[in-house]
Amino acid sequence: MSGYIRNEILAKGAKYVAALNIPDPAATPEGAAVMAMSPVVGAALTTFADTFKLWLREGLTGQPVQWIDAKAIFATVLADPAAYGFTNITVPACDAEKMALLTGGLVTDGFALFCNATPGSPLTGLRVGADADTWFFADGNHPSTGGFKALSDEVLKQLKAFGWI
């Protein structure tokens, strides 16, 4: 990834480049389930994310790139969800059973990409009572629209702090 940023983005003249790490996979609903079954495997998920961050930062040392710590942003939001308008940070908003029905059984794992499986009918795969704006996770690993908004709000603050906006 750092090689791509150096060789394909910076080398071609990009002036405003920000790199994000990945949030801690163990902090997601699926990661929490893995931790409950096997703390060793759950810890490996965190190590994976930390290693990615290390390699990415190391590969960009000395480059004109601003670093955005998505892992820290997610940790902050998950530590005080109400401050960010979230009412649920443990259960995915998308309902795997509904998505399986909507896709004719083609999608059975609840992957958020298919939460809106019916064209023209937004978010038809939501769990009863779920709100994609106040439930942080869409599926076991990915943020909901509200989760991504929280991330983008924090990224925007950092871009302003960099003087880019």
Q: What do the PLM-derived regions correspond to, one by one?
A:
Residues 7, 18, 22-25, 29-35:
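Structured, solvent-exposed acidic/aromatic patches
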Residues 30-43, 47, 58-141:
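Mobile gating loops/cap/lid regions near enzyme active sites that modulate substrate access
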Residues 3-4, 40, 47, 51, ...:
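Extracytoplasmic/secreted proteins, especially bacterial periplasmic and envelope-associated proteins
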Residues 10, 16-21, 66-69, 136, ...:
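Structural recognition of the beta-strand scaffold that forms the well-ordered cores
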Residues 129, 145-165:
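Terminal and linker regions of secretory-pathway proteins
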Residues 4-18, 48-68:
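A structural motif corresponding to the C-terminal end of an alpha-helix
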